[in-house]
Design a protein with these regions (language model features):
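Surface-exposed, glycine-biased beta-strand/turn segments
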Residues: 1-60, 89
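Residue-level detector of conserved, well-ordered beta-strand and adjacent loop positions
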Residues: 12, 35, 65, 74-77, ...
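Residue-level recognition of beta-strand microenvironments
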Residues: 14, 52-53, 79, 96-99
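A short local loop/turn or secondary-structure capping micro-motif enriched for an aromatic residue
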Residues: 20-21, 51, 59-60, 72, ...
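Structural recognition of the beta-strand scaffold that forms the well-ordered cores
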Residues: 33-35, 41-43, 63, 72-74, ...
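Short histidine-centered loop motifs in beta-beta connectors
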Residues: 42, 52, 66-90, 114
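Conserved, short, structured surface segments that act as functional micro-motifs
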Residues: 60-66, 85-132
């Protein structure tokens, strides 16, 4: 099963080249930014917590492993789970925030298949086509 990472989805910055909102230079945005204001963040698929951490760019983040896929959820105000915790599609994994290198509160998602980054829009389209 698969679901969206938020109750409602509004893309504020898509995957691809863009003008960086902090330094103004053109750069690759390796994820997708979603509008989120202190909202619960949900696991998109069944899997387990691979890593929980903090860094200056991503802020508080959690990485979930779903077989050959990983999904990183970044800039969280809170992470609710520890590494190795099993998750199911729809499990609350944290709360959105603006930690790290962010211009405001949002959810940044990075998706990988076998370690290769791909456009999260592909998963979002899959969710949309499989909703009941």
């Amino acid at each position: 099963s698969i679901t969206y990472p938020l109750k409602s989805i509004k893309v504020t910055s898509p995957y691809g080249y863009r003008c960086d909102p902090i330094n103004g230079r053109k750069s690759m945005h390796h994820g997708i930014d979603l509008q989120a204001h202190n909202e619960y963040v949900y696991s998109m698929m069944d899997g387990k917590v691979e890593k929980v951490g903090y860094d200056a760019r991503s802020g508080n983040y959690i990485i979930l492993r779903h077989a050959d896929f990983t999904i990183s959820y970044c800039h969280l105000s809170k992470v609710h789970l520890a590494p190795e915790t099993p998750v199911f599609a729809g499990t609350i994994i944290g709360k959105s925030g603006s930690t790290g290198r962010a211009t405001g509160e949002h959810l940044h998602i990075v998706t990988k298949h076998k370690g290769i980054i791909f456009n999260p829009k592909i998963l979002f389209c899959y969710v949309k086509s499989h909703q009941k």
